[in-house]
Amino acid sequence: MPDRATYHSLFDAVDRYFDLMFDSDVSRFDQVFASSAQLHGLLRDGNLRPLPAKDYKNELASGPSPKSKNAPRQQEILLVDFASPTQAVVKVRVRADTLLYLDYLSYHHIAGAWLITAKSFHVEHRYEVPTN
C-alpha cells in the first residue's frame, strides 16, 4: 500500500494533467507525459487512433486552448489503482472545450516524478457550440 506522500504526489500529477487539458501550455507537457507515452482512442467511425506523445503535444500547441475560449472547466478523478508505489492507473473525466473525455491514465514514477506513459481516451459527450 502506498504511503500518504505517494498519494499526494500522484494527485499533484493528475492536477498537472487537468491544467494541461485546460490551458494547453505545452511548456509543461514534459512534466505530464513521458516522451515515450502513447495515446489511443476510437474515432467516430470506430477506427483506433494511435497517437505518440510528440504528436499530441503538437496538436495541443497548434490550436486555441479551452481556457482561451472561456470554455467551462470540468474535471474529476473517478478511480485510483496502485499496482505498486511506482505504478498506478487513474480514471478521470475531463472536459476540453466541447468534448467531455473519459480517460484511463497509466502513470509511472520515473526519476522522481509521476508521468503518464499511456492514455486511453473516450469521448463521453459532445457539447453544442454556443452560437451568439
PLM features per residue range, with description:
Residues 35, 85-86, 112-113:
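Beta-strand-connecting loop/turn residues
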Residues 100-128:
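Short beta-strand edge/turn micro-motifs at domain boundaries
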Residues 2, 9-12, 38-100:
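Surface-exposed, charged secondary-structure patches
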Residues 1-35, 51-54:
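Short, low-complexity N-terminal intrinsically disordered segments enriched in polar/charged residues
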Residues 33, 94, 120-121:
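Short beta-strand segments enriched in hydrophobic/aromatic residues
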Residues 17, 96, 103-105:
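Amphipathic, hydrophobic secondary-structure cores in small proteins
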Residues 37-38, 125:
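Short secondary-structure capping/turn micro-motifs that flank functional sites
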